[in-house]
Amino acid sequence: MNTMLFFCFSSKDRHSIVESILFHLTNYGLPVWYDRHKMLLGDERDNKNFDEGVKACNYSIIILSANTIASECANEEIDLIYQRYKQHKMYVFPIFFNIKASQLPEKYCWMKRLVYKELTVANDSRSACNHIICKVTLDELQKYKIKTINEYLKLYKNNKAFSYLTELIDSYCKISDENHNAQIALLYAGCLYIKEKYNCCLEIPEFYYKGIKRLFEETRLNLPIDLRETLIFERLFLLLFNAAIFGYTI
């Protein structure tokens, strides 16, 4: 099964919150099953939404609001998502929009057992998206040999074939934890080197490398970067390295 996120929401929330979250996720190149991109007039809804949508995805984002609770279509999706969650076939990211966890009807209280995010129109949805990207990249790394920077150094520190990357990583590890822009600049240099030397981007998922440019642009414009975004960049670097050296693993 390919990594893909199913987006469950009420169409009434599309412009107020859904498209903001979609914007951030697609900026990272994450594959999202989004009805406007996947469904056309005349399509068989159950087949497209359930078989090609929910059942084909291993992650789901549920935007739960008063509108979602009142939506028959969204509730059909939530019922199937819950089944797959109980079968350990789907990881769920609950986002409560304009509703408190304490206000949820009994049917939806299972989501309160998960780490959830409460958002309003006034909140920045980027933080919630960073949680999602952190989880997806962490899971993706489990497919590969090198899962952490320390594992890379343990295996390749004295390997002359990777001396340039090792020097970058050594410098990265010596930077203050608060200096996120400098950390990202070094990781970006390493990613550019890997892409140029191994020409691997044609064979790997877009989200392995698209977020690299997006995060670097934030540092170039001197936008604030936090620890979670630095962690995302570190994982993207490791994904790119693993795929280049060992080959992409589905």
Write out the residue ranges for each language-model feature.
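Charged, amphipathic alpha-helical linkers/stalks
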Residues: 131-170
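Conserved N-terminal substructure of TIR/SEFIR domains
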Residues: 1-59, 82-83, 90, 171-250
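Alpha-helix boundary/N-cap detector
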Residues: 120-123, 127, 156-163, 181-185, ...
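A short, terminal or domain-edge coil/loop segment
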Residues: 17, 86-97, 118, 144-160
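Cross-kingdom TIR/SEFIR domain
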Residues: 22-141
